[in-house]
């Protein structure tokens, strides 16, 4: 199984890069804007379970790849993980959509851009699931080659998602989100620091 091992590691690394963007909803500040705070709470409460789902999907892929598993097992795990991620990003997009525009300058554009990006990421993960499902698990070299292509797509995907949310979380929106307990616990760093 040595043939696919470096590729699997690359895949796992690309994936964890993608998950970081959802888990990056933390920072610190304390200005008061009730409307914005209630918007942030609404989004954060919805994001938290999805962030956990993405984290679990990542963990599953990393476990499968570090165990030097057979191609068929890697395929099965990756396929489920990509489906979970697709669902999670769709749900986060829906949450941002339903929350309406945050009460800041240009809030509507920020919101719409983020929703558009999140939906696009959801679709991209669904496409990766289809790609991984089609890989030939009987031919190890071909399987490794296919995974390499998927890892490349993931790199791009994590970057675009990161940009979408970075934009939404700029300024007061990010500060309001940082104060929400659910966003703190969804973040990759332990709260209480």
Model-derived regions: residue spans:
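Immediate post-signal-peptide N-terminus of mature secreted/exported proteins
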Residues: 30-84, 185-192
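Short, solvent-exposed, charged loop/turn and helix-capping segments
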Residues: 90-115, 128-140
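Long amphipathic alpha-helices with heptad-repeat character
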Residues: 47-54, 58-61, 82-85, 118-121, ...
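Short, charged, amphipathic alpha-helical segments
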Residues: 37, 41, 72-83, 108-115, ...
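C-terminal motif of bacterial Sec signal peptides marking the signal peptidase cleavage site
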Residues: 23-27
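Extracellularly exposed regions in secreted/surface proteins, prominently low-complexity, repeat-rich
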Residues: 33-51, 141-193
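Bacterial N-terminal signal peptides that target proteins for export
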Residues: 2-16
């Amino acid at each position: 199984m040595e043939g696919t091992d470096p590729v699997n590691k690359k895949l796992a690394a690309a994936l964890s890069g993608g998950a970081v963007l959802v888990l990056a909803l933390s920072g610190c500040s304390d200005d008061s804007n009730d409307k914005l705070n209630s918007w942030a709470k609404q989004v954060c409460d919805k994001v938290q379970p999805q962030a956990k789902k993405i984290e679990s999907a990542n963990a599953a892929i990393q476990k499968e790849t570090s165990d030097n598993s057979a191609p068929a097992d890697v395929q099965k795990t990756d396929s489920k993980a990509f489906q979970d991620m697709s669902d999670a990003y769709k749900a986060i997009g829906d949450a941002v959509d339903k929350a309406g525009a945050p009460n800041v300058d240009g809030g509507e554009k920020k919101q719409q851009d983020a929703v558009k990006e999140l939906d696009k990421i959801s679709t991209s993960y669904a496409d990766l699931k289809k790609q991984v499902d089609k890989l030939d698990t009987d031919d190890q070299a071909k399987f490794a080659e296919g995974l390499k292509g998927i890892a490349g797509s993931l790199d791009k995907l994590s970057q675009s998602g990161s940009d979408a949310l970075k934009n939404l979380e700029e300024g007061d929106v990010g500060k309001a989100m940082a104060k929400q307990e659910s966003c703190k616990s969804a973040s990759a760093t332990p709260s209480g620091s």
